[in-house]
Amino acid sequence: MSGPSSWRRAATVMLAAGWTHSSPAGFRLLLLQRSQNQRFIPGAHVFPGGVLDAADSSPDWVRLFAPRHTPPRFGLGPEPPRQPPFPGLSHGDADPAALPDDVALRICAIRETFEEAGVLLLRPRDADPASQEPSQALSPPAGLAEWRSRVRSDPRCFLQLCAHLDCTPDIWALHDWGGWLTPYGRITRRFDTTFLLCCLRDTPRVEPDLAEVVGYQWLSPSEATECFLSKEIWLAPPQFYEIRRLDNFASLSALYRFCSDRPLEGGEKWLPIILLTSDGTIHLLPGDELYVKDSDFLEKNMSTDKKTEEIVKEGKVLNRVVIHSPYVYEIYMTLPSENKHVYPRNYVVNKRCTAHL
């Protein structure tokens, strides 16, 4: 049994980049294909990211950010309100010398993006982080493969790389978006993952590490959904939900404005509760009428003898993902937006796997 103390903290960044190949207004998301040898969701297409390392919160970063950016916020602005933790979930007391979570998790996401995809979300140390337009990734340095190997072996080397390039992690380009806790189920490795979003003017060059990551695609939200339905890629429910949420935005500029206008709102972190029906699975999310915020559901599921269709028809207040099969998900949403965020629109699939919004 995996109690709260065994959960691993992680960060992931949804990279949305301008796409001039078809439409100047559109954007594409970077999805990395995980190796089949990975223990956690092998073969899935995911956003770049990984587990928080002690090196990400090391006070040694303070010297690199100085003198332009100083503790405790390093220019990120006022701290957003903290969401009450899920009952029974705690990570213990933080090291008082460590960087704040907001900073450390951003460094983690940036480091992992470099390790997995070879993309450097860095900014020259003397650059002003204030910007009215999306950021740009740094051109890959000479000796990319050697540096990446060093960082993979020892995350502390990422600080050395940044110092070598006279850059800092571009923490200001990463916006709070939300977060997901791995639900109780067959997956024994569970993560407390912060989701961040970064808008880039152009698609950077991507070089998969060919270890954890064996391929990648730049896809719009609608293209990613179509590829999932046609079994070209596989998405875990959180990635599917977030991709459908991003489908609310018609352009990169609209997405960037949205993120820039809500910096003080922060992001909600959700623990899905799994409801096992007689013929399927439903992931219940906060706000749904069947959702129960109780520590018991850190280590158990709900179950019913009813069919999925019955449960769906009975519902009035909904925030749920219905899992019909590994490649057929539906989203049911009736909640108004909160915290100046957006929810995905209803997404229903007919028997021929044609989606209806």
Curated annotation (Swiss-Prot):
The reply on keyword Magnesium is: yes
Motif Microbody targeting signal is found at: 355-357
The Nudix hydrolase domain is annotated at: 10-242
Q: Name one GO cellular component term.
A: peroxisome
The record's section on InterPro entries has: NUDIX_hydrolase-like_dom_sf, NUDIX_hydrolase_dom, NUDT19
Quick one: a GO biological-process term for this protein? Answer: coenzyme A catabolic process
Q: Where does Mg(2+) bind?
A: 112, 116
Q: Where is this motif: Nudix box?
A: 97-118
Localization (cell): Peroxisome
Report the record's disulfide bonds: none
EC number(s) recorded for this UniProt protein: 3.6.1.-, 3.6.1.77
Protein name (database record): Acyl-coenzyme A diphosphatase NUDT19
